[in-house]
UniProtKB/Swiss-Prot annotation:
The gene is fluC. One of its GO terms (cellular component) is plasma membrane. This is Fluoride-specific ion channel FluC. Na(+) binds at residues 76, 79. One of its GO terms (biological process) is cellular detoxification of fluoride. It is found in: Cell inner membrane. GO terms for molecular function: fluoride channel activity; metal ion binding. It comes from Chlorobaculum tepidum (strain ATCC 49652 / DSM 12025 / NBRC 103806 / TLS) (Chlorobium tepidum). Belongs to the fluoride channel Fluc/FEX (TC 1.A.43) family. Pfam families: CRCB. It comes from the Bacteria. It is a multi-pass membrane protein. Keywords: Cell inner membrane, Cell membrane, Ion channel, Ion transport, Membrane, Metal-binding, Sodium, Transmembrane, Transmembrane helix, Transport. Fluoride-specific ion channel. Important for reducing fluoride concentration in the cell, thus reducing its toxicity. The chain crosses the membrane at residues 6-26, 32-52, 68-90, 102-122.
Amino acid sequence: MVMKNVLLVGAGGFAGSVARYLVALAVPFSGTGFPFATFAVNLLGSFLIGFISELALSTTLLSPEARLLLTTGFCGGFTTFSTAMYETGGLMRDGEALYASLYVAGSLAGGLACLFSGTLLAKLWQ
């Protein structure tokens, strides 16, 4: 049972990491230095984990294994706190304190808003 769960998380993490990489390739780096790709995947991942978790908790649509695959696995691999902090440090190092502050504040506030939006949409969808 434990090995099955480890494999589910690994498979989801692989898919999420590849998806994040593809978003980074698709979203051009702006001349401002603002990390739009990481910002977008973290907000989308927050929405997805809210939506998936609500469905898993309040319906029988997702098995515990599917929830593990999609939340801990995919969303965990898709989103990236460490990259966000690395990029924030880079903005600070480059003298872009305003962008760094907006990035951190926007990531936290936007992430929570997306999480709750995903949860609400799942409740309405049921």
